[in-house]
């Protein structure tokens, strides 16, 4: 079955765990099936999925599990680190499974410049046999995706999309101007309406873990430029509630609070205890559901 990867909404999915830190496969399948029901693409093993806290064997097990479900929505897998050989090994494994596309983040921690970034991304794109979405998230990597990367690689056959999460609308506009054929996704839930105005065509979302149906409608209206000031306030509140402490703590806490996963357990260094007050999530949940009921 051919899968269309140009889904307007991908959910950066959490990885549910039991209290001992082992993966809760039953809860994981339920989350995946929920996303499938609402026709959301799924991103597994991104930062929201705590990929860097899982060892290689666990990551492989996650990919096997998800791809064996034969979901009817596209499956994107995160690629990220600072050891190129390991990333290429990871891609090689994923390509033995039914993975549809990759999310490739700027190298972590090392802050490479334009030439170094270009070399890194070219090596990854050359290895990949699937479409790749580059990922600009300087709040996590310490460096922006260099514009020269897009100038040099925009015609690479495996470069498909860009996830933009710098918070800089003008930077997104420049990326779009440099590579107009690149599909741009907002990587920030609350900024989708603004990024849609400068060329974004979709969202890679954290909050759709919590509100998949409602977020799908929000994406549709944002891309149609139909979001009002009042609508914007609702979704900004929803975004704040899911990022009040380090992601994915709030999402896991809320999913567990609503019995959608068994526990709110995270892998070290993250602890659910960072979020003691659920008032922002409770308020946002009410706002989002009220908004949706009046659409």
Curated annotation (Swiss-Prot):
Keyword Metal-binding: no
Residues of the site described as Part of a proton relay during catalysis: 47, 109
Location relative to the cell: Cytoplasm
InterPro entries noted in UniProt: Aldolase_TIM, DapA, DapA-like, Schiff_base-form_aldolases_AS, Schiff_base-form_aldolases_CS
Main location: cytoplasm
UniProt record, GO biological process: diaminopimelate biosynthetic process; lysine biosynthetic process via diaminopimelate
EC identifiers of the protein: 4.3.3.7
UniProt keyword list: Amino-acid biosynthesis, Cytoplasm, Diaminopimelate biosynthesis, Lyase, Lysine biosynthesis, Schiff base
Pathway it works in: Amino-acid biosynthesis; L-lysine biosynthesis via DAP pathway; (S)-tetrahydrodipicolinate from L-aspartate: step 3/4
Active site residues per record: 135 (proton donor/acceptor), 163 (schiff-base intermediate with substrate)
Reaction catalyzed: L-aspartate 4-semialdehyde + pyruvate = (2S,4S)-4-hydroxy-2,3,4,5-tetrahydrodipicolinate + H2O + H(+)
Gene Ontology, cellular component aspect: cytosol
Keyword Amino-acid biosynthesis: yes
MF (Gene Ontology): 4-hydroxy-tetrahydrodipicolinate synthase activity
Binding, pyruvate: 48, 204
Short name of one Pfam family: DHDPS
Transmembrane domains' residue ranges: none
Source superkingdom: Bacteria
Oligomeric form and interacting partners: Homotetramer; dimer of dimers.
NCBIfam families: dapA
HAMAP family associated with the record: DapA (MF_00418)
Family (UniProt): Belongs to the DapA family.
UniProt-recorded name of the protein: 4-hydroxy-tetrahydrodipicolinate synthase
